[in-house]
Amino acid sequence: MGKIIIQSLTTEKPISVMGMEAGICWGGDVTDEEKNYKRGLDCLQSGHLRTAEYPQVYMVLDGYSARVIREFYTHIAGGPTRLQASTRYINYKDFDCIVPPKVSKDPLATITYLEAIENTQTALQTLEKAGVPKEDSANLLPLGMATKVVVRTNLRNLIDMAHQRLCSRAYWEFRILMNDIIEALAYYSSEWENLVKQHKIFKPKCAVCGFCEEKYSCGAYPTKEQNDEYIKLGKLIKNKDFTSLLLYLTDEDKHNLVKLLSLEK
């Protein structure tokens, strides 16, 4: 697939930067690195993520499809900016194209897919010989074409992006892209490594809220409706409202509950 290059302009100590900025507002000592680090962790653990907009991430996304980059562009929180490889000035007559897994595992589908790419490349070369400018012939380029993007974003935006794009129902290439970004950040500095591996701040939304909001859940977490029922049952058990509780139980559940209550006595 593609690769992520974290640029040197990226904040090296994101946790400390968060703590320092928060400390200024709280009247704290911002000259002490250890205090800044602890304060930054407290912000993360308390969900005070406005401070997470201060750590900046500069990166190059290279070799991912134009299609997934279009989806990447929908994450606009925190004022990110980006530049994409030009289709006007760069010659794409021999462009690379992403082959989806469901295509590559089928020999006939693979042949059909690669032939379509080859036909497009041939058409681009023919148009070039006919004197058609690249900015016009580029209209033929497919969404699956590999491209390169320079991005500036921030920690908070990436946390939110992970909530959406690490979901098992997210587009497969974006899941790969998101994991590649996380892996590259973990390698960039020790504080980023702590954020990724120790504090695990990048996770799907179901792991954050404890239930799944998707209509077609993968089953890793209960749906919101199931979770609401569990909460109701928990309250009934806590209040020992057995009359209401019996309405939720099968005959086997009732038998097991009687056994459990007899053991407690």
PLM features: residue spans?
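Family-specific signature for flavin-dependent thymidylate synthase
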Residues: 1-265
